[in-house]
Design a protein with these regions (language model features):
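Papain-like cysteine protease catalytic cores
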Residues: 32-179
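Cys/His/Pro-rich metal-binding microdomains
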Residues: 15, 166-169, 285-288
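A short glycine/serine-rich beta->alpha loop
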Residues: 8-16, 87-91
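Carboxylate-rich, divalent-cation-coordinating active-site regions
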Residues: 21, 168, 311
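Exposed substrate/partner-binding surface patches
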Residues: 1-9, 30, 40-50, 65-69, ...
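Active-site nucleophilic cysteine motif
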Residues: 16-29, 54, 58, 92-103, ...
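Short metal-coordination and nucleic-acid-contact micro-motifs, chiefly zinc-binding Cys/His arrays
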Residues: 17, 161-164, 280-283
Length: 407
């Protein structure tokens, strides 16, 4: 096996070990995050077993097998066995790549934090230096709490901070919350309707994904907030059994995708995400200065961006909303990031696409920018390419963007 990853590393497929196309697509995209794979391939845990750090060793096994010199597809049976302890990923029913990404990031970050395996980036602490002084104590507390519980290359690369400012309509007091995210979900139907009707949705902040450190008791202005760690708990164990199917290819349709002339851009998605939020009616905000529920306005912005942006183009499960999403290989989000010292320019490195009429079944593939800077399509064990640019196949579902300095 090779002990390094570079432009000479050959692209390899992954065997389907039982309706695992959703898993293989995710693994290919994470593997093609070069700063991640390049560091992990040197990790060695001689005194630890798969029972102690199962997700870490399973992913490391994938990285090393995909980096080996032979041309045979890698067999990710260890990874499949590890995720099968979660009922959501047991058996051969249809599964969603998004759910695996969430579960994978949570578990492997926990394991590496426990081992204290972390890089020296200290990205989040550097972000504090440019924070307005009035908010520094609040943010510093959240950052330090975060860094206590997340000490791995995954938290360094994939995690960022979202900032929300809420202004009371009566006293105009501003309250600022910070939430940690490791991917962002864009509701495509909402984005399309907002663009079409110029009537923005007022509830998009719920689409930020990840356990968050968010104030549950709004403090007076300028005072530190008190935080609670809102975890997913039994989300996976309580997953809707109706999402299961005995055959993942049941609803597959490999024909052309008719978008009915509906389209939005990735920039439209970001615009919708940071647009003003109106808290009215049942969504009123409690103002501790006015001592009652009142209308309020909110504003979202990315405070500190992550080195890897994972963007979910959510079209629904049972009946996918048919709308083309236009995106480029080069992405600049400077307009949507408050801390300009954070990454704002990215390169597209991976696209997970869905083939099929319904989100309840179908087939997942991954297109990735390989380490030779060429694009390849990974359809389980079949690898096609190379190409100089990403070529759309199926319906793009999950986008991976990497800080351009790592390309």
């Amino acid at each position: 096996m090779s002990d390094q990853i570079n432009e000479y590393t050959k692209p390899k497929g992954l065997e389907n070990v039982g309706a695992t196309c959703y898993m293989n697509a995710v693994l290919q995209c994470f593997y093609h995050v070069k700063p991640l794979s390049s560091e992990l391939i040197h990790y060695n845990f001689p005194n630890l077993s798969v029972n102690q750090i199962p997700m870490t060793l399973a992913f490391l096994d994938v990285v090393k097998n995909l980096s080996s010199g032979n041309n045979n597809p890698a067999r990710p049976i260890l990874f499949k066995n590890v995720i099968s302890v979660n009922p959501l990923f047991t058996g051969i029913q249809a599964n969603d790549s998004k759910d695996l990404i969430l579960y994978f990031l949570e578990k492997i970050d926990q394991e590496l934090t426990f081992l204290n395996y972390f890089s020296q980036n200290k990205f989040f602490f550097n972000a504090i230096k440019t924070m307005p002084k009035v908010f520094k104590p609040e943010l510093q507390y959240i950052v330090e709490l975060f860094m206590t519980n997340h000490k791995s290359i995954f938290s360094d690369l994939f995690y960022g901070f979202m900032k929300q400012t809420i202004t009371c309509s009566k006293c105009h007091q501003e309250l600022t919350n910070y939430q940690i995210f490791n991917f962002i979900i864009f509701p495509i139907e909402t984005v399309y309707n907002s663009k079409k009707n110029n009537n923005k949705n007022n509830n998009n902040y719920k689409n930020i994904s990840k356990s968050t450190y968010s104030p549950y008791n709004m403090p007076p202005a300028g005072k530190p907030s008190y935080t609670s760690n809102s975890e997913y708990g039994n989300f996976y164990n309580n997953y809707n059994n109706n999402n299961k199917s005995s055959n993942i290819y049941k609803n597959a349709n490999y024909g052309s995708y008719d978008n009915n002339n509906k389209s939005v851009s990735l920039i439209d998605c970001f615009e919708n995400e940071i647009d003003d939020i109106n808290f009215k009616g049942d969504n009123q905000i409690y103002c501790n200065k006015c001592n009652k529920l009142l209308d309020a306005k909110g504003k979202n912005i990315i405070f500190s961006s992550s080195h890897v942006l994972i963007l979910i183009l959510n079209r629904g499960k049972a009946n996918k909303f048919e709308c083309d999403v236009e995106f480029e290989e080069d992405l600049d989000i400077k307009k949507y990031v408050e801390n300009k010292e954070c990454p704002t320019k990215y390169k597209l490195i991976g696209v997970i696409s869905h083939l099929g009429e319904s989100g309840m079944g179908g087939h997942f593939i991954a297109d990735c920018r390989h380490f030779d800077n060429k694009w390849y399509c990974f359809n389980d064990s079949i690898v096609s390419g190379p190409s100089n640019h990403y070529n759309k196949k199926g319906i793009p579902y999950i986008l991976f963007y990497l800080n351009e300095k790592y390309i």
